[in-house]
Amino acid sequence: MANEAVVKEVEMRNAVCKTLLGGVILMGMQMGIPIPSAQAAGKYAIILQAGKESHEGMARAVHALLYTRELKEHGHDVVLVFDGAGTEWAEEFTKPDSTHKLTPMYRELSKLGVTKIICDFCAGAFGVKERLAQRQLPLVAEYAGHPSIAKWIDQGYQLLIL
């Protein structure tokens, strides 16, 4: 019984706090005071370097796609970069007849408007450049044949490398 009373008291306090805070925010808005969002949108470049040959590479690819989607859905600016052995994933995901279980996640990113780029040099080094070029995908060679990470940092992006 004592626990139920404590729980009810905590619930009541939380309800009162929410009501008071809501009233303060409403008053501020009515007075023309800008109310900042809880979190300003950020900028992220998610760089997938892991290849297709291992369980770890699969996990990194899953998380690169998952993090990209979540950040985009929360209003952040996100760029997905396929670099190193990660260019193999770009080749797999863009096959017209791909049946890989991660391909639907990749295609969903296109619907969300995520920018995707592929390292030109690494696509060649990992033997997928010709197929990617035939599909007219964005092969980028800004710095020594690779995408420039300085460019993204200069534009305020945070890098997440998987």
Regions found by a protein language model. Give the residues of each.
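C-terminal segment of classical bacterial N-terminal signal peptides
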Residues: 27-35
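Histidine-anchored nucleotide/phosphate-binding helix
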Residues: 59-74
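Bacterial N-terminal signal peptides that target proteins for export
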Residues: 10-21
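Short internal beta-strands
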Residues: 68, 79-84, 116-120
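A glycine-rich helix N-cap at a beta->alpha junction
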Residues: 96-128
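A short aromatic-anchored loop/beta-hairpin motif
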Residues: 108-109, 126-147
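Short, glycine-rich nucleotide/cofactor-binding loops
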Residues: 45-62, 90-94
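Boundary at the C-terminal end of the N-terminal hydrophobic targeting segment
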Residues: 38-40
